């Protein structure tokens, strides 16, 4: 402890980092208390919030603060070299995948508690595979987990608000109309729920822990890094081909309701439901689609509309002269 105090006294950067940690966890604690009314929307939620959710979130903030400061105090003067991935890291990645599944369903799925356990395991497995692919491309367990946590929180907001505003679940095909969505998004009123606040706080805590964790990599030398990316690309391609060509969804009992994707998401989980529906809704134009023909039809329709308006204006002018 004396060494830690001496380091803070002599090093301005260390004092700034310590102040940032205090501010970081202080803001999360204040946010939790300010968002307390959002956790008590109904009588049942209020009872659950008072006796479980709010105390657990507060305890998580306190515990993460203690762990974070202990890590900060025990940090060596020199940055430790990255280690190779061992058997412990996949276990942590699997635990993180389970957490990502739980937070995504907590925000977006009103039937989360009714989901069958083997569908929950299937969702965790899919997220775990995605985590492995990302970690291979980034050559870093820590950076991959930080990316996955932030990405899944953002996707939970996308799934929640798209369904709230449109009444239909977000699908892969919606990426075609992302520009239109960006134009109209300002006209909607965004309301934050208790689930979103809870997910945000836990995400920030988990990201903080991953930021202070030891760096583990698959390769160190440049040649090995290049080979790793090539292998990751080949593995990704193989995973995609298996995903598109194998009847995995039927084998696991996942029935895609293409007319009501939200039902599929709620029943089988958002991750599995999204991938199952996306399998039959590719980002490819339908048969016979021609951009030039669509443009020509639109131009013709616009000209006909202008002609009809001109005729109507002439008729109104003639009628006015007659009167």
Segments the model singles out, each with a brief description of its role:
Residues 246-323:
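Soluble catalytic regions of membrane-associated enzymes that act on cell-envelope
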Residues 2-265:
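Transmembrane and membrane-interface helices of multi-pass
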């Amino acid at each position: 402890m004396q060494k830690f105090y001496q380091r803070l006294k002599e090093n301005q950067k260390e004092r700034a980092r310590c102040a940032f940690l205090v501010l970081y966890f202080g803001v999360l604690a204040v946010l939790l208390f300010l968002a307390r009314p959002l956790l008590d929307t109904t009588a049942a939620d209020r009872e659950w919030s008072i006796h479980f959710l709010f105390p657990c979130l507060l305890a998580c903030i306190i515990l993460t603060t203690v762990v974070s400061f202990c890590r900060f105090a025990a940090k060596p003067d020199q940055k430790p070299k990255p280690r190779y991935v061992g058997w412990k890291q996949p276990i942590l990645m699997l635990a993180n995948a389970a957490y990502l599944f739980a937070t995504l369903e907590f925000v977006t799925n009103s039937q989360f508690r009714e989901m069958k356990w083997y569908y929950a395991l299937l969702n965790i497995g899919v997220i775990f595979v995605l985590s492995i692919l990302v970690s291979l491309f980034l050559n870093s367990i820590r950076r991959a987990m930080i990316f996955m946590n932030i990405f899944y929180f953002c996707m939970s907001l996308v799934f929640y608000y798209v369904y709230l505003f449109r009444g239909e679940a977000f699908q892969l095909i919606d990426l075609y109309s992302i520009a239109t969505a960006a134009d109209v998004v300002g006209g909607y009123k965004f309301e934050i729920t208790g689930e979103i606040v809870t997910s945000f706080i836990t995400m920030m805590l988990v990201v903080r822990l991953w930021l202070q964790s030891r760096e583990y990599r698959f390769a160190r030398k440049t040649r090995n890094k290049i080979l790793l990316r090539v292998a990751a690309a080949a593995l990704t391609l193989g995973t995609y081909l298996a995903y598109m060509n194998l009847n995995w969804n039927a084998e696991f009992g996942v029935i895609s309701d293409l007319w009501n994707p939200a039902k599929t998401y709620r029943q089988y989980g958002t991750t599995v439901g999204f991938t199952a529906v996306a399998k039959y809704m590719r980002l490819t134009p339908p048969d016979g689609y021609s951009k030039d023909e669509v443009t020509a039809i639109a131009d013709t329709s616009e000209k006909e509309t202008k002609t009809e308006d001109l005729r109507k204006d002439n008729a109104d002018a003639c009628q006015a002269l007659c009167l």
